[in-house]
């Protein structure tokens, strides 16, 4: 008896309207399923990507968003059970609300981050609401599918989930390959919200128009029209809203900003206390340099590494062209390869006058070759050997960056490093993040290098550290090459003093970082949490 009751519970309504038993109606409903699935996955990806840009720690952001949304989807499915008696109206309302909340989700979270400093609580609430609404879609769509044509529950489930998964595939690919490059995060979410609203219109207007009373249908269509108007108005104002919110996060006027598929790029300009212009580059909110004192950082990063042979040089990272500028000052340099992940960064360094002026057009120097590729992947395929390697990656505050500070990465690097070559690695701050700094040094040593650690002061950064390394057991001397041009900051005395670490910042007991155990990611997230 229990089995019979269960079978009846999942069976389709016994008397589905005959006028809806058409292939066209079924196709349109499955199209709505496809659109809903694609939109749902895009919302999920948009939330995880935004969190990674604004907060970092992509693993945590992804885990929280997915966990909260999957939990909420289960709750939403249960909450939709009482609504199956009026599935057309319920589905239209769910789609309208989901279109509004999902479409505005990126803007709402960006505003919460910029003005309220409440990103994580807001992200959890938005993920919960979006998940509840997505979860309510499936049981309602299942009921509607059975009303079109009665079929076994297993067959209906198979059809529904097949289309659902295909829609998720398309949405997952569409987000990084089309929506982000074409519209950006904020406008992309708004466009997807419009698609979500269209899915509701398909059901109400084209499939079940005869089952919906005139007043109800008019009310639903009016609601959808309001949602579309809200999304459309926000789309028109999106650029101004984004600029206002973004400017609130930076002390100085923004002169350029763009969001690429890899990162958020912002350039600001103000007047320093000396009266000279202060141009600053930020990636995902983290300061990369100030034009007032960047020479201190880049002289320290480049010139000690070129104290040995330096005819053929490799730079990894440094898409702004400033490290390349310093390398090209050496007369002995014949060829430089710069590997930078984001083509938007190197394009900006070439064409945006404030950056081009700083890097002195280095990316267009005939001795320089720019390669836009993932450094880890490029290194696995590289065969040419280099006399010196300059590594200028951002701090390893995400899993994708932590792999570039791993034992495996430095193992690969040895394959392209000449036997007498040297490597310089920017390694963060020994003062603010000592465990991170010494973990990077230990990781390099674990990969078979001898190291020399040193630190400098960069006013816009504070204390900053580097690691000079070469294969073998003999630590490389910290010195300048004979053909070193006249420098503004470095000389022999400064380098000698730079190797002295105070007692409270000397080497500590830390783990090396590997792909399977990214210790440096753990350290950097812990030490930079309060800054």
UniProtKB/Swiss-Prot annotation:
Keyword tags: Cell membrane, Membrane, Polyamine biosynthesis, Spermidine biosynthesis, Transferase, Transmembrane, Transmembrane helix
KW Membrane (keyword) present: yes
Active-site residues from the entry: 392 (proton acceptor)
GO cellular component, one term: plasma membrane
Pathway in which this enzyme or protein is active: Amine and polyamine biosynthesis; spermidine biosynthesis; spermidine from putrescine: step 1/1
Keyword Transmembrane listed: yes
Membrane-spanning residues: 27-47, 59-79, 96-116, 122-142, 160-180, 188-208, 218-238
Entry similarity comment: Belongs to the spermidine/spermine synthase family.
Name the UniProt record assigns to this protein: Polyamine aminopropyltransferase 1
Source organism per UniProt: Streptomyces coelicolor (strain ATCC BAA-471 / A3(2) / M145)
Organism taxonomic ancestry: Bacteria, Bacillati, Actinomycetota, Actinomycetes, Kitasatosporales
């Amino acid at each position: 008896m229990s089995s019979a009751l269960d079978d009846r519970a999942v069976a389709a309504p016994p008397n589905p309207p005959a006028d809806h038993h058409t292939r066209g109606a079924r196709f349109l409903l499955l199209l709505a399923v496809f659109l809903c699935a694609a939109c749902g996955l895009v919302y999920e990806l948009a939330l995880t990507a935004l969190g990674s840009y604004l907060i970092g720690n992509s693993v945590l952001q992804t885990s929280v968003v997915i966990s909260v949304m999957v939990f909420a989807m289960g709750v939403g499915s249960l909450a939709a059970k009482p609504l199956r008696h009026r599935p057309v109206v319920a589905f239209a309302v769910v789609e309208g609300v989901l279109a509004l909340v999902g479409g505005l989700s990126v803007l709402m979270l960006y505003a919460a981050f910029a003005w309220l400093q409440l990103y994580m609580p807001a992200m959890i609430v938005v993920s919960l609401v979006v998940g509840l609404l997505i979860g309510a879609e499936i049981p309602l769509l299942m009921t509607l599918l059975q009303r079109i044509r009665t079929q076994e529950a297993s067959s209906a489930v198979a059809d529904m989930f097949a289309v659902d998964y295909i829609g998720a595939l398309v949405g997952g690919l569409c987000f990084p390959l089309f929506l982000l490059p074409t519209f950006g995060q904020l406008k992309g979410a708004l466009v997807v919200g419009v698609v979500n609203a269209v899915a509701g219109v398909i059901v109400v207007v084209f499939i079940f128009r005869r089952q919906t009373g005139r007043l109800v249908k008019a009310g639903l269509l009016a609601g959808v029209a309001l949602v579309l108007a809200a999304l459309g108005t926000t789309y028109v104002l999106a650029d101004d809203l984004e600029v206002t919110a973004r400017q609130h996060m930076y002390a100085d006027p923004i002169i350029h900003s763009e969001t690429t598929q890899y990162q958020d790029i912002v350039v600001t300009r103000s007047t320093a206390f000396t009266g000279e212009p202060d141009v600053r580059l930020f990636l995902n909110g983290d300061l990369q340099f100030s034009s007032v004192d960047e020479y201190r950082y880049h002289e320290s990063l480049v010139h000690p590494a070129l104290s040995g042979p330096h005819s053929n040089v490799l730079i990894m990272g440094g898409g702004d062209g400033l490290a390349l500028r310093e390398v090209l000052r050496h007369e002995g340099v014949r060829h430089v390869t710069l590997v930078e992940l984001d083509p938007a960064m190197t394009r900006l360094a070439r064409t945006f006058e404030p950056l081009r002026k700083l890097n002195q057009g280095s990316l267009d120097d005939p001795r320089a070759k720019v390669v836009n590729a993932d450094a880890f992947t490029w290194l696995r395929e590289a065969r040419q050997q280099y006399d010196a390697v300059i590594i200028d990656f951002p701090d390893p505050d995400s899993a994708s960056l932590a792999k570039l500070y791993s034992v495996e990465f430095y193992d690969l690097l040895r394959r392209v490093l000449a036997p007498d070559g040297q490597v310089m690695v920017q390694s963060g701050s020994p003062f603010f993040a000592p465990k991170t700094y010494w973990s990077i040094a230990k990781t390099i040593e674990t990969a078979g290098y001898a190291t020399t650690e040193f630190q400098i002061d960069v006013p816009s950064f504070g204390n900053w550290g580097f690691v000079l390394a070469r294969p073998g057991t003999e630590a490389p001397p910290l010195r300048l090459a004979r053909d070193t041009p006249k420098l503004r900051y470095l000389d022999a005395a400064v380098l000698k003093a730079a190797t002295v670490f105070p007692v409270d910042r000397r080497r500590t007991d830390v783990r090396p970082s590997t792909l399977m155990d990214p210790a440096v990611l753990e350290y950097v997230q812990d030490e930079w949490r309060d800054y």
